[in-house]
Amino acid sequence: LFHAAEAEKLKNFIEKQETDEQALLVSAVMLNIQRYFDPQKYRLLLHFCRTEHTKVRARAMTAAVWTYMQYEKRFVYYPDLSDGLSLLAQDERLKGELILLQQQFLLSLETAKAERKLQNEIFPDLLRSRNYQRNKMGFEQMEEDLAKALRGEPNAEWEKMRGNKQLADNMKEIIAMGKEGIDINLGTFSALKGFSFFQSVAHWFTPFNRRRPEVKSIFPPGIRHNPIQMLMEAGNFCESDKYSLCMMLNQIAPSQRDMMISQIGSQIEGNEEGLRDVAKESMNIGSVYRSYLQDLYRFFKLHPRKTQFDDPFKRDQLFTRYTVLESMLKTPAYLREMASFLMKRECYQDAIAYMEEALKHETANAEMLQKVAFCYQHTDRPSKAIYYYQQADLLSPNNEWILKQMYLCYSALGRYGQELDCLKSLEEMNPGDTRLISEIGLCLMQLGRYEEAAQRFYELEYNGERVVP
């Protein structure tokens, strides 16, 4: 354990370094404190949470939060550490970054889902497509289209291709995931972590620097617009993946490498302005946190000696599970924002906790009540869902969407009388709707009112329609 004087020396030493070295040293402190809890080192992390260097601050904030999650019970004996962590939320900038960090923690848990989507659906669909012809250079068109997709540029031709709608839908989903901040590059780069460069733990956390001897041959001096540099600046690459890309290029014969770089250059020619705009976006604070979390995910999931480290991604990442973290951000606005975020992720049970907490602090509105009800409905609790839908209906009467959800809940509970009431209200709003007529007929059958049901089905038959299952 450090004494205060030793911690002060380490702090002074770190502050004298360049920004990239500071960032690397803060990551080293995080790994150290993961292995052996040290209150002095935690105070050091809290200090760097307030630095003006964005890259350093993001690493210190991540380390401070994860360390608290790991050692929450010990913090009872160090009230100054809990207070120091709580005080971060008094700074509006840091409070915003804590929210970013919470969201990025949760997005990181979807990495495996994105990887399965690529490996099990998109790649096989591409390989089966007759529109991609193999030649001596490989699946050129496939690689170009996939690269566009991963950059967020959908190919309009996909939807025109016969039988390719599922492929287009899958690609759009992956594009949307990437835009939300979900890591869609893990599968591509996981095979590129076997280079000797990554045998050093430090290299998994080293900020990318094109002047490093291991990669400088990829960036020869005198080239004003290096295509690889432009690609790295504009792409959603974390620091570790940038090194992987350079290591891979270093393995290629110089003549082939030059040809590949030339091809990349020709593809981005004319799009320099757009790439510069994307590069500016990649420098914002959200991108800094996203990039670092991706570096961490790769280290804890792919490092050859990963079992020797405590994997923070295996812990519960929701701040509401931890006393101090919950108290730091417990405002109605934050609770609503996180509830909506969790709903988009289909984490309905956790979204309920956030929304019900928000309802304790502010007057309910129809939108919030609808969201709570929807979450209960999707966690197989239709009775609770109906309770909130009924309240929402009082605030927003004759709402077609609410009535649709209510009839589904009543149907799930076998309460066919109330289901019929909802269906008839919907029919008044949508006279002649085939599906509604069919649903009403089926509901009447459940109630044993067969003659009325038959009249509904005759109505469909008369109009040349059939019962919609």
What are these regions (language model features)?
Residues 40-43, 47, 353, 387, ...:
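Primarily a tetratricopeptide repeat
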Residues 357-360, 390-394, 424-428, 458-462:
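Conserved structural position within tetratricopeptide repeats
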Residues 59, 333, 367, 400-401, ...:
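Start-of-helix register in tetratricopeptide repeats
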Residues 96-99, 107-266:
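Non-catalytic protein-protein interaction scaffold segments in large eukaryotic complex-forming proteins
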Residues 202-396:
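Alpha-solenoid helical-repeat scaffolds
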